[in-house]
Amino acid sequence: MAYSYEAPVSQSLFDRASVVTPGGVNSPVRAFRAVGGTPRFMVSGTGPYLTDADGREYVDLVCSWGPMILGHSHPEVIAAVQEAVSRGTSFGTPGEGEVALAEEIVARIEPVEQVRLVSSGTEATMSAIRLARGFTGRAKVVKFAGCYHGHVDALLAAAGSGVATFGLPDTPGVTGATAGDTVVLPYNDLEAVRAAFAAHPGEIACVITEASPGNMGVVPPADGFNAGLKELCAANGALYISDEVMTGFRTSKAGWYGVDGVRPDLMTFGKVMGGGFPAAAFGGRGDVMAHLAPAGPVYQAGTLSGNPVATAAGLAQLRLLDDAAYARIDAVSAGLRSLVGEALTKEGVAHTVSAASNMFSVFFTDRPVRDYEDAKQQDVFRFTAFFHSMLAQGVYLPPSAFESWFVSTAHDERAVERVAAALPAAARAAAEATA
């Protein structure tokens, strides 16, 4: 399908990038392969808006895939970064900023007794898995189809997100030996977890799950699912790892833990905690974290872990996220979900708007979506038409039907009105789309 609007400067940049970068991008979903057309190269962001290289402004409902919870270029975050940069960009030593950020995380997330800072969500989950194996002396890891935990080899099996976007069942380069200790189960199925423990007695080091998945679209845990995972892990000597890279500090002050109250053994964080910079963390029970080097035998390290600029940005952002901020984000999200649902209903488009706190996505099916298989049954071609209509009208959505939409405290009445104005035409485009 051809799209009538053009982005010549973005196209020129994409052509240049494609010569020197595989696929023209540094993260696959940015390439627009799932939706077609020219990926937009952004040059600036202010509040709820992005401006591309062609000078077009968009209401941003991606928020850098979650981190920009205060909107773009928040003055207090920018000031904190500028002050930190003025003192240097990296020292390779401990610094007060990393201590302060760790203290903030521990204060907000009650199950986290100690935390280790890293530079990406992938590093956080990779390190948490290694720590769980080292602590338990076991090898096997249970994960769920559709849950994405970064691009670490052992966790890419049935990983949702990028692999769902590109229709890949797995990825070349992950060996059978690497994936052999990974047990992949259907999401929201406690009986499958119980059966896995029975099939592998004394072998499972941990069960890892997105606290509330957002990488197959937003598919919240069924009532009692996370609590059931915790109980099964405790009964079988395994650790329960809650991946809050996406939900952490977004779905509440204490992330998804603040929503369901289930106490994990280990947790991973990223996105919001970095304030737009590469920063992430993993933490949890003190007795487990004590196994990390240099205190214990499980090795983990990183040259830029605890970077002073990243920790300054993250700390500034977290300190601005009070109860009022979350109330605002939740209200904006609820309003947008209602507007989207009304527009699609008016045009007779089968859909399900699924939310986890202020994260949400739209599945183009009217059937319940409880797991990865359900998510894949939607009419993705309708999302493609919807996406391009919104983009042409100045609303930037995730370029994939399998990703969460995000809002920020900066999404004001004007931004919401612009989204509302774009929805009728986008809903008609979805209704008229053909496979």
Swiss-Prot record:
Co-factor(s): pyridoxal 5'-phosphate
EC number annotated for this UniProt entry: 5.4.3.8
One Pfam assignment: Aminotran_3
CDD domains hit by this protein: OAT_like (cd00610)
Pathway per the UniProt entry: Porphyrin-containing compound metabolism; protoporphyrin-IX biosynthesis; 5-aminolevulinate from L-glutamyl-tRNA(Glu): step 2/2
InterPro entries to which the protein is assigned, alphabetical: 4pyrrol_synth_GluAld_NH2Trfase, Aminotrans_3, Aminotrans_3_PPA_site, PyrdxlP-dep_Trfase, PyrdxlP-dep_Trfase_major, PyrdxlP-dep_Trfase_small
Keywords: Cytoplasm, Isomerase, Porphyrin biosynthesis, Pyridoxal phosphate
Chief localisation class: cytoplasm
Subcellular location: Cytoplasm
Positions of post-translational N6-(pyridoxal phosphate)lysine modification: K271
GO molecular function: glutamate-1-semialdehyde 2,1-aminomutase activity; pyridoxal phosphate binding; transaminase activity
Name of the protein: Glutamate-1-semialdehyde 2,1-aminomutase
Species name: Streptomyces griseus subsp. griseus (strain JCM 4626 / CBS 651.72 / NBRC 13350 / KCC S-0626 / ISP 5235)
UniProt gene name: hemL
